[in-house]
A protein has these predicted regions:
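N-terminal helix-cap/turn-to-beta initiation motif at the start of protein domains
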Residues: 1-8, 19-20
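Beta-sheet ligand-binding and adhesion/scaffold domains
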Residues: 9-16, 24, 49-88
């Protein structure tokens, strides 16, 4: 699927990787801690009524703009495809 890959926020929010595992799509977020280490969290993506949601405990709507190759998270803002691998 075209959405797979590394994504970075246009507004300095945590980056994420979208990937497929065992037939399910997942998102791993990367957040830098105050000590400078990278903390990761992985969430499953589900589909409800034709909409994609990241299951974080809250409903985070994920919309992919194929024409502009952008992802919009609501809440969370706009993400663009990363040109370089995310530091893990």
């Amino acid at each position: 699927r075209a959405m797979r890959g590394d994504w970075e926020s246009v507004k300095n929010r945590p980056a994420f990787t979208l990937f497929e595992e065992n037939g399910h799509y997942r998102v791993t977020t990367y957040r830098k801690t105050y000590r400078g280490t990278i903390q990761t969290e992985t969430y499953q993506i589900s589909e409800q009524d034709g909409n994609l949601f990241i299951e974080t405990g809250l409903s985070v709507l994920l919309t992919y703009d194929k024409e502009n190759d952008r992802i919009l998270l609501s809440p969370g803002g706009e993400y663009k495809r990363s040109n370089q691998p995310i530091k893990r």
